[in-house]
């Protein structure tokens, strides 16, 4: 979800999304605002849409729906700066936050170590975030690390909400595979 684009986020919730990833959350105050905007009363102040896909398009009382949706919908905050990592414990302590997700690519960029996902400073950031998440009963998450040597390191540390890849990369790999196959069928047409 684009940072701060709550209208888009709530539209996604109304249309059946069971979680929202909000990027660049650097402080507990920002995390509280995310919860306030994405959780339904009494936890937050997200507006309840009408009859939606969560209930098979059947009606449900707003109280029943709010409680069920607050329990089912994941509120995922991305920690993508050294400031966010320094504030990880305070962010994790915010009620209604379900997942702390390190955006490793942006974190590396902010640290001045673009693409160095195995750097010890990044590992330290994961240790900090995972400890904070565990202390407050949240899921520690990892995004942006798809290297099959580095990814297991952070999973072994305790990352449990793991983005295993990107849709665009999966599509590009599939397209490259198919293109290679087609070129083999018609070697003279390259």
Predicted region positions:
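Expand to "…catalyze enediolate/carbanion chemistry for C-C bond making/breaking, isomerization
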Residues: 1-190
């Amino acid at each position: 979800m684009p940072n701060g684009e709550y209208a888009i986020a709530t539209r996604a919730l109304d249309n059946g999304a069971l979680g929202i990833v909000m990027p660049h959350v650097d402080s507990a105050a920002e995390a509280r605002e995310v919860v306030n905007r994405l959780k339904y009363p009494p936890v937050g102040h997200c507006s309840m849409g009408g009859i939606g896909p969560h209930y098979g398009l059947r009606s449900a009382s707003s109280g029943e729906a709010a409680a069920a949706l607050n329990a089912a919908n994941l509120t995922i905050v991305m920690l993508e700066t050294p400031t966010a990592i320094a504030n990880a414990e305070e962010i994790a302590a915010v009620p209604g936050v379900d997942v702390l997700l390190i955006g490793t690519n942006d974190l590396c960029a902010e640290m001045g170590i673009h693409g160095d996902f195995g750097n010890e400073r990044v590992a330290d950031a994961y240790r900090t975030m995972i400890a904070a998440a565990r202390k407050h009963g949240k899921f520690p998450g990892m995004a942006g690390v798809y290297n099959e040597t580095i990814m297991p390191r952070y999973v072994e540390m305790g990352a449990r909400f793991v983005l295993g890849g990107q849709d665009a990369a999966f599509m590009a790999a599939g397209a490259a595979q198919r293109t290679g196959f087609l070129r083999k069928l018609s070697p003279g047409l390259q």
